[in-house]
UniProtKB/Swiss-Prot annotation:
It comes from Arabidopsis thaliana. The gene is RLP12. It is found in: Cell membrane. InterPro entries: Leu-rich_rpt, Leu-rich_rpt_typical-subtyp, LRR_dom_sf, LRR_N_plant-typ, LRR_R13L4/SHOC2-like, Plant_LRR-RLKs. It is a single-pass type I membrane protein. It comes from the Eukaryota. This is Receptor-like protein 12. Residues 820-847 are cytoplasmic. The lineage of its organism: Eukaryota, Viridiplantae, Streptophyta, Embryophyta, Tracheophyta.
Length: 847
């Protein structure tokens, strides 16, 4: 919505400029008398740039630029009808593709008033010579590639009314000389890389109506001198690094229609002087550090259309007076500390209000039946509060409602049938238990999130009618029965499918042949049997597969190697069997980052080159986001932490970094040597090969894994010495060599000395453990432990379920589990953040 408002004021300023140019053009009527010096200057100017198609198109429109025609008739050129002097050059979108030279012939046009070079692909610095064109009233260099500082000489243009330098790559400080432009009406410097403070001299521009300095790197406080701009209509300072309190003088700007300070570090209270800004239609203070309550009755802003104070620390009761503003269309109050119940009985905004976003506050009580008064409501978000009771039946009167998010409350009862007509329904983390019966034949939901409720029985048949479904999360419920094959009805559109943590039985239907958009599939923690669906080979967009903790009985799906984007594969705790390696499978998992196939019945050996093509574990690719991320039309992005921000899904643990790499082959029957190619995986953080039958010595190439943090090779048949080279792995915080046939000295080194004595148990020939085992009193920990204690040790690294943040609700799971039940849970907490100690064997994430 903020983007929409931003475009609104940009569009308004463009209209002002367009009308100004139109009036000027109409005033310059025939006859035209082009002066030779003006014509020659224009031709020389054109000669400074390569000829290209855009010039050709321009010439066809109003005639060619050449000596045989009147230059006053040339495209983009306007002359004074008396003197023949060129007074306007308006050639946007001509893609000049060159520098604007300091000695350009453009600067011979001394009587130029209007200069519009919008989107001409100009680069280099803005020539200081521009300041010599003293008649200029408009300079528009919008959307080019100009670099360097804004020339101070522009401050000499005392006739200038419009200065538009936005969307370039300008650096340096805003020159204080701009304060000399006493006739300036429009100043647009947004979307550059300007630094420093906003100069006080900007407050001298008494005629200014539009000031946009958004999306730069400006620092310091908002100067109080801006309060002198009594004609200002638009004030946009978003996306900078401004600090301190907003000066009370801003309340002097009584003509202000648009005020946006979004995404800075402003703090303190809202000045009480803001009560003077009664003409505001757009009021945005979001993503700052404002505190306290609103110091005035909000209904005084009787022209307000868009109100956004989200992502601050405002407190106090829900500001009901906002609902008395008849023109209000959007209210964004999420991520604050508002308290109390909400009520809509006394509202004047029932016919206008479209967006009501109240998520992540401290609101409580029932959802009022008076919600039905908001007849035009399209989006309602009251997630992450303490609302109780049932969804009121009056919600059926909101016939325009498209997006509903009630997640993370204490709501209960049945889901009204009318909600199937929505586009987005997010009801996760409540206590809903059933669905109202409906005869509805059609449903248009694209995003449906019912996770973490108390639903039971078979999947609602209405889900089978969602032919456009893109996101479905039914996880953490009590659904039972078979997974219906009718999910093929939306297989062509589904991207995220999470049915994990239910009681589904039967087979996983092999119905994914048309699921070419599928990104994430999670059916973990059910009772599914049978084969692994081979139709997944058609899902070329697939990034995550999690079938953990089922009863699937099949051979290893090596054909998944062909999926170009598969990052996470979790087959843990099933009945998979047979060898991992097939001689016809030669591609390798090139994109795999996390694999967990532990606690199955895999057997056989791995050839030395088995990991040779696992490229994503060898080198990191440059990625924009730090965390695995997915974007949805209705939901915000989900990196930084794996919780829903707008209309998505919550998770129990925090995000996982994109650079995390892990392999867990533990609890199988794999034998032979540890493959040599494992040493190529230099980005690997976790390696668990425990509980197999690997033989020979511990390979020295493991010392090549310089980012390794966890190494568990316990409960194998490894012999020989522990390589001294492993002591050089400075990130290695946990290792386990117990229950092997190792001998010789334990390497000296800080990482080894910090391990627990149990990490070396049952290796009869090991010695040098005096310092490590001093606290236990077992200086020679080589005897076989009782079976139950041994089992506890070997399960220490069942590290399943570290999550993967794929986007507006993707499903994930993988890499956590028994870290939290063992002495090493501190390591996991440090890496992934603290939340409730709620999932001991797995973690649910919705990407």
């Amino acid at each position: 919505m903020m983007i929409r408002s931003h475009r609104h004021w940009v569009f308004s300023s463009r209209i002002i400029i367009f009308l100004s140019l139109l009036v000027h053009s109409l005033a310059s009527s025939s006859p035209h008398f082009c002066r030779d010096d003006q014509r020659d200057a224009l031709l020389e100017f054109r000669g400074e740039f390569p000829i290209n198609a855009s010039w050709h198109i321009m010439n066809q429109w109003r005639g060619p630029w050449n000596k045989s025609t009147d230059c006053c008739l040339w495209n983009g050129v306007t002359c004074n009808d008396k003197s023949g002097q060129v007074i306007s050059l308006d050639i946007p979108n001509t893609f000049l593709n060159n520098y604007l030279k300091t000695n350009s012939s453009l600067f011979k046009l001394q009587y130029l008033r209007h200069l519009d070079l919008t989107n001409c692909n100009l680069y280099g610095e803005i020539p200081s010579s521009l300041g010599n064109l003293s008649h200029l009233t408009l300079v528009n260099l919008y959307f080019n590639k100009f670099v360097g500082e804004i020339p101070a000489s522009i401050g000499n243009l005392n006739q200038l009314r419009h200065l538009i330098l936005a969307n370039n790559v300008l650096t340096g400080e805003i020159p204080s000389s701009l304060g000399n432009l006493s006739r300036l009406v429009n100043l647009e410097l947004f979307s550059n890389r300007l630094v420093g403070k906003i100069p006080d001299s900007i407050g001298d521009l008494k005629q200014l109506r539009n000031l946009s300095l958004a999306s730069n790197n400006l620092i310091g406080e908002i100067p109080s001198s801006l309060g002198n701009l009594s004609n200002l209509v638009h004030l946009v300072l978003t996306h900078n690094q401004l600090v301190g309190e907003v000066p009370a003088s801003i309340g002097n700007l009584i003509e202000l229609r648009v005020m946006s300070f979004e995404n800075n570090s402003l703090s303190g209270n809202i000045p009480i002087s803001f009560a003077n800004l009664t003409k505001l239609s757009i009021f945005v203070l979001s993503s700052n550090n404002f505190t306290s309550t609103f110091p005035f009755d909000m209904s005084i802003f009787h022209n307000l259309e868009y109100f956004d104070v989200s992502y601050n620390s405002f407190s106090g009761p829900f500001p009901k007076s906002l609902l008395l503003i008849p023109s209000l269309e959007s209210i964004y109050l999420q991520e604050n500390q508002f308290t109390g119940p909400i009520e809509f009985a006394n509202t004047s905004s029932s016919t206008k209000l479209q967006d009501l976003i109240l998520g992540r506050n401290r609101l409580h009580g029932p959802i009022p039946e008076s919600i039905s008064r908001l007849l035009n409501l399209e989006e309602l978000d009251i997630s992450h509060n303490n609302f109780t009771g049932a969804i009121p039946p009056t919600i059926s009167k909101l016939v325009n409602l498209l997006h509903l998010d009630l997640s993370k409350n204490n709501l209960e009862g049945e889901v009204p049938a009318c909600l199937w007509r929505l586009n987005t329904m997010v009801l996760s983390h409540n206590s809903f238990s059933s669905f109202e019966n409906t005869s509805q034949e059609e449903a248009l939901i694209e995003e449906l999130d019912l996770n973490s409720n108390s639903f039971q029985g078979p999947i609602p048949y209405m889900i089978c009618k969602l032919s456009s479904l893109g996101f479905l999360d039914l996880s953490n419920n009590l659904f039972s029965g078979s997974i219906p094959s009718c999910i093929r009805n939306f297989s062509g559109s589904i991207k995220e499918l999470n049915l994990g943590d239910n009681n589904f039985s039967g087979t996983l239907p092999d119905i994914f042949s048309k699921a070419t958009e599928l990104v994430s599939l999670d059916v973990s923690h059910n009772q599914l049997e049978g084969k692994f669906p081979k139709s997944l080979i058609n899902c070329k967009a697939l990034e995550l597969v999690n079938v953990e903790s089922n009863k699937i009985k099949d051979i290893f799906p090596s054909w998944l190697e062909s999926l170009p984007s598969l990052h996470v594969l979790n087959l843990r705790s099933n009945k998979f069997y047979g060898p991992l390696y097939h001689r016809h499978a030669s591609i390798g998992f090139q994109s795999l980052r996390i694999i967990d196939i532990s606690h199955n019945n895999f057997s056989g050996t791995l050839p030395p080159y088995y990991f040779s093509n696992w490229k994503d574990m060898t080198t990191l690719t440059e990625e924009m986001d730090q965390y695995m991320t997915e974007f949805w039309r209705y939901a915000d992005s989900y990196y930084h932490e794996m919780e829903m921000v707008n209309k998505g899904v919550d998770m129990s643990f925090e995000r996982i970094r994109r650079d995390f790499r892990a392999i867990d082959f533990s609890g199988n029957k794999i034998n032979g040597n540890i493959p040599e190619s494992l040493g190529y995986l230099k980005e690997l953080r976790v390696l668990n090969l425990s509980g197999n039958a690997f033989t020979s010595v511990i390979p020295r190439f493991l010392a090549n894994l310089t980012k390794l943090e966890t190494l568990d090779i316990s409960r194998n048949k490894l012999s020989g010495q522990i390589p001294q080279d492993l002591a050089a792995l400075s990130f290695l915080s946990y290792m386990n060599f117990s229950h092997n046939l190792l001998q010789g000295p334990v390497p000296r080194g800080t990482q080894f000395q910090r391990q627990k004595c149990s990490s070396f148990l049952d290796n009869p020939g090991l010695y040098g453990l005096e310092d490590i085992c001093r606290d236990t009193g077992a200086l020679n920990p080589t005897s076989q432990l009782p079976e139950d204690l041994s089992e506890a040790e070997e399960n220490m690294f069942n590290w399943v379920a570290a999550a993967i943040a794929y986007g507006p609700g993707v499903l994930c799971g993988l890499v956590i589990g028994h870290f939290y039940t063992s002495h090493n849970h501190e390591w996991f907490t440090e890496k992934f953040g603290r939340k409730q100690h709620k999932a001991l064997t797995s973690v649910k994430c919705s990407l």
